[in-house]
Amino acid sequence: MGMIVQGCEATIKVIALVGERGREIPEFIHYNLNNNLENTVIVTATSDESPLMRKYAAFTAMTIAEYFRDKGYDVLLMMDSVTRFAMAQREIGLSTGEPPVSRGYPPSVFALLPQLMERAGNSKKGSITAFFTVLVDGDDLNDPIADQSRSILDGHIVLTRDLTEQGFYPPINILKSASRVIDKVVTKEHYNDFLKLKRVLSLIKENEVL
């Protein structure tokens, strides 16, 4: 996240830290942002706060991003993490008597995700480019929150534990990552090179046990 924030050209950066441990927030500011908070808004709700606080921290960050977008700015929004936002809504939903429908998550969780995520995007004056992190157990991409997020967003970048163990950083699994808009935002040559690279990586993956 810090690399993206420092390297982006967005005028305004909005960072939502939902469900993080309290000590991780100053560490993130110091080590990842190098204490540089210029044109940056940070919204936090730590793991020891109530589910309502964690839930509305995400919506507050999105509202702040929308405010600057409607003022004509290009905004970068980063939210860590959607999983903890969903867990907060799960606590709220189950406490009000909602039945769990998928791995303990009630229907309200899956109704809220598009209400949050689909607010990002362009307006007549500005734009919001949003990155939402999703945590999955054991790199299981069939996790219901990951699955629902993929169906809403324009693309996903998959980071895997096995690439981390091999020393790759950032550990991006190119074969599992995807973009619905890549052919619209890069040159034709770039896109063709990407397809060639993906075919090569696919062959390596198929034959890695040999």
State each model region's role.
Residues 1-210:
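P-loop NTPase catalytic core
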